[in-house]
């Protein structure tokens, strides 16, 4: 049921096994799958005709929707940096231009904020798993946080807090060396 000028007609829209995904048949042949958001955005319905340019745009928008789903699922477990999200999308074979659009969209929505990540990371490491500023700096650098953001986050880590945490760690180590001689204990502590 082809129409004029290379236009194709949607002959069937069916749900896929994965929730929120739909199969589109053009001229009684499977053409592509789309996310529900793309289906709604383009008003895809049985009987609608599509040209090649529109089909290409629909497929591109669907690729963005897939990448956004990957990123949101990854973000659902914990705060993430831009670098971590890009790496996750790269692992799932998402194109660079689509990655950039997804990151821009997530940043605009406030879901990705490297400064916020750094601040929360420092606060968590101070309270839950006591770590010094050097270890925290290395972890944040590995996560892809910019140096100025790391500096800003570590500025909240006061010298008194560092001393308190160092004392706590030293006391914990001392308990492990109680059976050792005093001289050996001091050597291991330094």
Segment roles from a protein language model:
Residues 2-190:
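An alpha-helical, amphipathic repeat domain used for nucleic-acid recognition
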């Amino acid at each position: 049921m082809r129409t004029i000028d290379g236009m194709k007609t949607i002959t069937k829209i069916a749900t896929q096994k994965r929730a929120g995904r739909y199969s589109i048949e053009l001229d009684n042949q499977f053409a592509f799958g789309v996310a529900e958001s793309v289906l709604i955005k383009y008003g895809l319905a049985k009987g609608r005709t599509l040209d090649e340019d529109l089909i290409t745009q629909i497929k591109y928008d669907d690729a963005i929707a897939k990448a956004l789903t990957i990123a949101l699922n990854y973000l659902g477990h914990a705060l993430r940096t831009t670098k971590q999200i890009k790496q996750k999308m790269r692992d799932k074979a998402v194109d660079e231009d689509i990655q950039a659009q997804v990151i821009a969209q997530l940043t605009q929505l406030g879901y990705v904020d490297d400064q916020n990540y750094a601040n929360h990371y420092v606060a968590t490491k101070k309270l839950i798993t006591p770590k010094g500023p050097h270890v925290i700096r290395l972890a944040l650098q590995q996560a892809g946080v910019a140096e100025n953001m790391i500096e800003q986050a570590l500025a909240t880590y006061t010298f008194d807090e560092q001393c308190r945490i160092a004392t706590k760690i030293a006391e914990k180590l001392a308990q492990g060396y109680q059976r050792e001689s005093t001289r050996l204990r001091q050597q291991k502590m330094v």
